[in-house]
């Protein structure tokens, strides 16, 4: 017993301050650290990512894509904290999308409304119903539970841009974390989606579009985000979307988590691999243009959202699912322009994972 | 022995949507210690009402489920080998839901 206690005491001091009892093993460094040091390194690392990548300019209006989930809640909290502490000079807003999913989004929006008060950040909610005339509940009623995540993902991506335009912000930040990005790298490899593979690790995307997006949590482990939210008692919502059993992404996620358990660095290493891929100049990339119907960025005649919407409104919900066909011509019109920044807006299926 | 078990991050849905459970667990065999390994198998049998695969994989929690014993990451106390004491508070949080 004596020996056991000694051993416990020896390993029981934070390896940063050497004063307090550690409460967490950092996946990034395997260091055992106490709560106070954890808050400090967690926030400081995000600050360094923001500074080193010059994510913001003083005076900018910035929208935080807020779902009410753990990542965006922690992002809203940390970003408003850092904005105050380091005088970023940012005007921060919360931007939420109401997909119209009863029992899921209506509940999570209540969380965002509380966050609005808790963090003193103005909130804007834009709904699929207002933007497209359809709620996800109505879409699922019509198309069933197959491909519904495609609709949701495509619509969300545009909805965020439109909401950002309404807020007149210069930038949109999202809570995508290191685990999400590693998972997306893997998925893009599995799908052979070279265009997305080449951009999914960028910390800022869409700089040539209307509203650039950035991911301050690019190097932040999900474990630390959840621990931070837990220790700080942040108010977040955690229920799986009732419509989203996205099996393929689920497998990738589970694989990443299995790897993390064996070697936590695997997550950062996968991101590094993603960053360091060089796409052969002979690879055909989609050419970027604008949608003839709504003017949104599109590599096709019509953007994906317009194709999907047309299908819904005409009662042909299969339209636009799978490889481009129909309005946009029989063949995938992907052509040359090696190295051009690909920007087909067909979104990642499911969840809030848009890259 | 008495424990307070807390389920969060969506895991509460697996046990009748109740987040906090005050439980009393008798020592299993003759041994006088109870480890996290014992507790997990007790939880799986007695508290998890549906989809146990969302909570466990093999004899431990599913990767992506965080465990805290008295507000301390169980990776610091030996994970499955963590020895529990009366009135310990054990928290399980899933990281696998939403963003």
Curated annotation (Swiss-Prot), chain A:
Keyword DNA-binding listed: no
Gene3D superfamilies (UniProt xref): HUPs
Lineage: Eukaryota, Viridiplantae, Streptophyta, Embryophyta, Tracheophyta
A molecular function GO annotation: nucleotidyltransferase activity
Any GO CC annotation of this UniProt entry: cytoplasm
Primary residence: cytoplasm
Protein name (record): Cytoplasmic tRNA 2-thiolation protein 1
Origin species: Arabidopsis thaliana (Mouse-ear cress)
Listed Basic and acidic residues bias regions: 328-337
Protein family per UniProt: Belongs to the TtcA family. CTU1/NCS6/ATPBD3 subfamily.
Sequence segments annotated as region (Disordered): 320-341
Cell compartments where the protein resides: Cytoplasm
HAMAP family: CTU1
EC number: 2.7.7.-
Methyltransferase among keywords: no
Keywords: Cytoplasm, RNA-binding, Transferase, tRNA processing, tRNA-binding
Protein's pathway: tRNA modification; 5-methoxycarbonylmethyl-2-thiouridine-tRNA biosynthesis
Pfam families membership: ATP_bind_3 (PF01171), zn-ribbon_14 (PF16503)
InterPro entries linked: CTU1-like_ATP-bd (IPR056369), CTU1_C (IPR032442), Ncs6/Tuc1/Ctu1 (IPR000541), Rossmann-like_a/b/a_fold (IPR014729), TilS/TtcA_N (IPR011063), tRNA_thiolation_TtcA_Ctu1 (IPR035107)
Function: Plays a central role in 2-thiolation of mcm(5)S(2)U at tRNA wobble positions of tRNA(Lys), tRNA(Glu) and tRNA(Gln). Directly binds tRNAs and probably acts by catalyzing adenylation of tRNAs, an intermediate required for 2-thiolation. It is unclear whether it acts as a sulfurtransferase that transfers sulfur from thiocarboxylated URM1 onto the uridine of tRNAs at wobble position.
SUPFAM superfamilies registered for this protein in UniProt: Adenine nucleotide alpha hydrolases-like (SSF52402)
UniProt GO BP: protein urmylation; tRNA thio-modification; tRNA wobble uridine modification
Top-level taxon in the UniProt lineage: Eukaryota
UniProtKB/Swiss-Prot annotation, chain B:
Posttranslational modification: C-terminal thiocarboxylation occurs in 2 steps, it is first acyl-adenylated (-COAMP) via the hesA/moeB/thiF part of the MOCS3 homolog, then thiocarboxylated (-COSH) via the rhodanese domain of the MOCS3 homolog.
Main localization category: cytoplasm
GO terms for biological process, alphabetical: protein urmylation; tRNA thio-modification; tRNA wobble uridine modification
Record flagged with keyword tRNA processing: yes
Gene3D superfamilies cross-referenced by the UniProt entry: 3.10.20.30
Cytoplasm keyword on record: yes
Pathway linked to the protein: tRNA modification; 5-methoxycarbonylmethyl-2-thiouridine-tRNA biosynthesis
Residues bearing the modification 1-thioglycine: 99
Keywords associated with the record: Cytoplasm, Isopeptide bond, tRNA processing, Ubl conjugation pathway
Protein's cellular compartments: Cytoplasm
Coiled-coil intervals: none
Cross-link (Glycyl lysine isopeptide (Gly-Lys) (interchain with K-? in acceptor proteins)): 99
Entry function: Acts as a sulfur carrier required for 2-thiolation of mcm(5)S(2)U at tRNA wobble positions of cytosolic tRNA(Lys), tRNA(Glu) and tRNA(Gln). Serves as sulfur donor in tRNA 2-thiolation reaction by being thiocarboxylated (-COSH) at its C-terminus by MOCS3. The sulfur is then transferred to tRNA to form 2-thiolation of mcm(5)S(2)U. Also acts as a ubiquitin-like protein (UBL) that is covalently conjugated via an isopeptide bond to lysine residues of target proteins.
Family per record: Belongs to the URM1 family.
Protein name (Swiss-Prot/TrEMBL): Ubiquitin-related modifier 1 homolog 2
């Amino acid at each position: 017993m004596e020996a056991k206690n000694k051993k416990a005491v020896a390993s029981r001091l934070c390896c940063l301050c050497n004063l307090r009892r550690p409460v967490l093993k950092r996946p990034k460094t395997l260091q055992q650290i106490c709560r106070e040091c954890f808050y400090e390194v967690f926030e400081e690392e995000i600050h360094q990512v923001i500074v080193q990548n010059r994510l913001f300019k003083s005076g900018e209006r910035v929208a935080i894509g807020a779902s009410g989930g753990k990542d965006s809640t922690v992002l809203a909290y940390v970003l408003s904290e850092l904005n105050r502490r380091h005088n970023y000079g940012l005007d921060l807003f919360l931007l939420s999308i109401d997909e119209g999913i009863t029992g899921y989004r209506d509940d999570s929006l209540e969380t965002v409304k509380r966050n609005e008060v808790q963090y003193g950040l103005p909130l804007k909610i834009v709904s699929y119903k207002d933007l497209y005339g359809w709620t996800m509940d109505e879409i699922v009623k019509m198309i069933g539970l197959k491909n519904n995540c495609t609709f949701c993902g495509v619509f969300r991506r545009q909805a965020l841009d439109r909401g950002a335009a309404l807020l007149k912000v210069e930038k949109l930040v999202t809570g995508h974390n290191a685990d999400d990005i590693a998972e997306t790298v893997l998925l893009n490899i599995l799908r052979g989606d070279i265009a997305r593979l080449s951009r999914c690790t960028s910390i800022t995307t869409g700089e040539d579009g209307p509203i650039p997006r950035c991911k301050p949590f690019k190097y932040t482990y999900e474990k630390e985000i959840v621990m931070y939210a837990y220790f700080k008692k942040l108010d977040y919502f955690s229920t799986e979307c009732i419509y989203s059993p996205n099996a393929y992404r689920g497998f990738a996620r589970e694989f990443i988590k299995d790897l993390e358990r064996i070697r936590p660095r695997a997550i950062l290493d996968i991101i590094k691999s993603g960053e360091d891929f060089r796409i052969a100049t002979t690879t055909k990339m989609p050419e970027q243009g604008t949608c003839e119907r709504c003017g949104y960025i599109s590599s096709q005649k019509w953007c994906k959202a317009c194709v999907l919407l047309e299908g819904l409104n005409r009662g042909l919900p299969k339209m636009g699912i799978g490889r481009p066909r129909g309005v946009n011509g029989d063949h995938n019109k992907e052509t040359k322009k090696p190295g051009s920044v690909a920007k087909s807006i067909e979104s990642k299926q499911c969840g809030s994972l848009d890259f | 022995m008495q424990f307070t078990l807390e389920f969060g991050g969506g895991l509460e849905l697996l046990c009748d949507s109740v987040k906090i459970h005050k439980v009393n667990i008798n020592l299993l065999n003759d041994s006088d210690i109870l480890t996290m390994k014992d507790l997990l198998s007790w939880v799986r049998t007695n508290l998890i009402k549906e989809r146990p695969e969302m909570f466990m994989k093999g004899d431990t929690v599913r990767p992506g489920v965080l465990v805290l014993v008295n507000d301390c990451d169980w990776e610091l106390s030996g994970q499955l080998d963590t020895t529990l004491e009366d009135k310990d508070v054990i928290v399980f949080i899933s990281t696998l839901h939403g963003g």
